[in-house]
Amino acid sequence: MRFEGERVVLAFGALEDPTQVDELEFLLERPIEAEIAPAGRVAELLKRHRGGEVLLEQASEGLRLQFVDDDEEDVDLKTLPAESPIVRLVDSLVLGAIDRRASDIHVETKDREVVAKYRIDGVLYPAIEPLDKRHNETIISRLKVMSELDIAEKRVPQDGRFRLRVKGRTIDFRVSIMPSVHGEDAVIRVLDKEQLNEAFRRLRLDVLGFTESDLVKLRKYITEPYGMVVVTGPTGSGKTTTLYAGLSEIATPEDKIITIEDPVEYQIPGIVQVPVNEKKGLTFARGLRSILRHDPDKIMVGEVRDPETAQIAVQSALTGHLVFTTVHANNVFDVIGRFIHMGVEPYNFVSALNCVMAQRLVRVLCEHCKRPDTNTQDLLRESGLDPELYQDQVFHEPVGCEECGGSGFLGRTAVAEMLDMSD
């Protein structure tokens, strides 16, 4: 809804009864201009506008978080009264993140308000309407209690975690609290391990979105007896998922596969997974040295961060092991520069390397509501493509529906480039 002079412009998902406009004009005592908008988008805006109120209403209907400890035993938190509106709001934010497939929950303190957002398919969406800034301390305190952090400490960052049992499955949450100019901010990573572990049992490379040619090459190199397979990309681009998919395809009782990760987020049957613990001195380099004494056939190093790890990984690949790893770089060619910068001899690295894959994740249009888009000529030209070559191609555009939460997108797929060392 917006005002244009004396007129009120209203968006309707569907206008089945035109007399509704007349009734509204009578009530508002102003002329109304009706516009038709996607029904999913209208529903999403209404839900967001009443977000805080709706969440509180839902939470008040006997909905409470069930906390469990590392041994799956129930935990009773001594915290704010159970009927506190802030407790119900935070609890509902957490449950809403699970229902909407969010990977992260952001609580940001602004100059005059507190904003809550969900990261869904890599994009931040408002979770509820902004709240008054006076609620900031209570919300952050609730999160600190949930994750067993120091409520009194507000000047330094704090990290914690908590675990819930929701709909019969256990879900982990990693909490990071950070002080800012206007107050404390929080980010909560949602790790639905049980659901994802089940998905990883069925995970294969051919469901990740790679082209057929890249898929054939990648499968060739992950079945080599030795060498190094490197996946690169920014944080959250699916590098670990790609490596897990590759390991799942080649895991057999005849091979011993050991991984070292920081942290071990998802468990794969038949594979020994070692978590990094830098506080106790277990770094990637030290863990990798220990792994080599356990007679592995294949090794996965979660990330190459330092020269020592890079050197050991390359030497392992040169001495008869198949090594999987990731490194942060912008593209496949930058990976070579990163390893050389970390002190690896160029000849050794190139000799050890089987292939490098750089990847990104892009959102996929929702299959339930996407519609054909005929106005694509300008976009094709801007992309450097000849529209004449795509005359018979049907393009689609996002719409928004209940299934995708009004965004028009549902899920993500990988886009990759490969450096094949045999070319």
Functional labels for PLM-detected ranges:
Residues 1-30, 48, 71-73, 158-178:
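Polyanionic, low-complexity intrinsically disordered segments
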Residues 1-8, 68-70, 75, 292-297, ...:
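Long, low-complexity, intrinsically disordered polar/charged segments
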Residues 7-8, 71-72, 76-79, 203-204, ...:
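Short, basic, glycine/proline-bearing loop/turn elements
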Residues 9-55, 208-215:
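Short glycine/Trp-rich loop-beta-loop segment that forms part of the substrate-binding cleft
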Residues 11-18, 22, 32-36, 80-87, ...:
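Ordered, soluble secondary-structure elements with a strong preference for glycine-centered loop motifs
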Residues 16, 20-21, 59-68, 114-117:
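Short, compositionally biased low-complexity segments
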Residues 39-92, 100, 185, 191:
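Charged, low-hydrophobicity low-complexity segments
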Residues 83-96, 100-423:
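Short, flexible helix-loop junctions that flank or precede catalytic/ligand sites
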